[in-house]
């Protein structure tokens, strides 16, 4: 997600989106240079370790965003490749995606044990979470567990309409996060 690092108070040295810009603009824009004799692939491999912010209890890799026009295909491919490389080094990998279905429909994260969908307490938000859960089934994703966390809930209590929509979508409610003005 483009702002999870901000919520956690982590400033990465570089994001995957910024790496994409470096690679795309190398040789065209003098601000972006790859060392002489080094291929773009070798440079990318070297710089990917800079995209992981190492904290006391976790490490964080930030996708970020591109600086200009362009497809996220390259960055999405980086995320997929890095998750595959890193999964043997960590007991857990949490991927915080932007809202929507792109990461699921593109198969960027094909292997997952647990899928936690997060929604606000609006009917539309819960319906979107239900569509994502259905898409995962259609695309043959097989997490061992799929559930919903509802975020920003007034007084930490879901109203009857939201609970009914969660049931209608066939989602398992894992928990709620109360609204916090801070």
Place the predicted regions along the sequence by residue:
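Fold-independent oxyanion-binding glycine-rich loops
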Residues: 1, 63-65, 97-98, 121
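N-terminal phosphate/diphosphate-binding loop that engages ATP/GTP or pyrophosphate donors
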Residues: 1-56
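Short active-site-adjacent helix-start/loop capping segments
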Residues: 3-6, 69-70, 103-104
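Functionally engaged cysteine thiol sites
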Residues: 26, 30-32, 71-73, 103
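Cytosolic-facing regulatory segments adjacent to core modules
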Residues: 40-50, 54, 59-95
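Conserved catalytic-core segment of NTP-binding enzymes
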Residues: 73-176
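C-terminal boundary of histidine-terminating zinc-finger modules
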Residues: 182
